[in-house]
């Protein structure tokens, strides 16, 4: 416990909060080959690996994920939401922040219905979250 005198000399310092999706906090200038401080809500990338992984206890499933090389040269693991997908290696995808609680190391989501990623077929509810067009009347 510090004394009042110690606190007068050196006040308490508040902790800076760390970003939960750090890859979205940097851009990349390919002309200068330097990172830039462009914070972005989404980033484009190329899938380098598509596969499944198993969640932490007590859950059990095969969750779909893609390893993505972003436009700022970061490589991240992103979750593919929804039932079924058309992604393969070299697919161009758009990612957003947002972790998957039962998959360690997965801090990003792939946006369905954007770039090479198709929307979920036959989805009727929450269509906007899964990139599905309105059904024909």
UniProtKB/Swiss-Prot annotation:
Gene3D superfamilies with a match to the protein in the record: Nucleic acid-binding proteins (2.40.50.140)
Superkingdom of this protein's organism: Bacteria
InterPro entries for the chain: NA-bd_OB-fold (IPR012340), Ribosomal_uS12 (IPR006032), Ribosomal_uS12_bac (IPR005679)
GO biological process, one term: translation
3-methylthioaspartic acid modifications at: 102
GO MF annotation: an example: structural constituent of ribosome
Region of interest: Disordered: 1-23
Keywords tagged on the record: Methylation, Ribonucleoprotein, Ribosomal protein, RNA-binding, rRNA-binding, tRNA-binding
Protein family (similarity comment): Belongs to the universal ribosomal protein uS12 family.
HAMAP family (UniProt xref): Ribosomal_uS12_B
NCBIfam families with a match to the protein in the record: rpsL_bact
Function: With S4 and S5 plays an important role in translational accuracy. Interacts with and stabilizes bases of the 16S rRNA that are involved in tRNA selection in the A site and with the mRNA backbone. Located at the interface of the 30S and 50S subunits, it traverses the body of the 30S subunit contacting proteins on the other side and probably holding the rRNA structure together. The combined cluster of proteins S8, S12 and S17 appears to hold together the shoulder and platform of the 30S subunit.
Subunit text: Part of the 30S ribosomal subunit. Contacts proteins S8 and S17. May interact with IF1 in the 30S initiation complex.
Protein name: Small ribosomal subunit protein uS12
Organism: Leuconostoc citreum (strain KM20)
Gene: rpsL
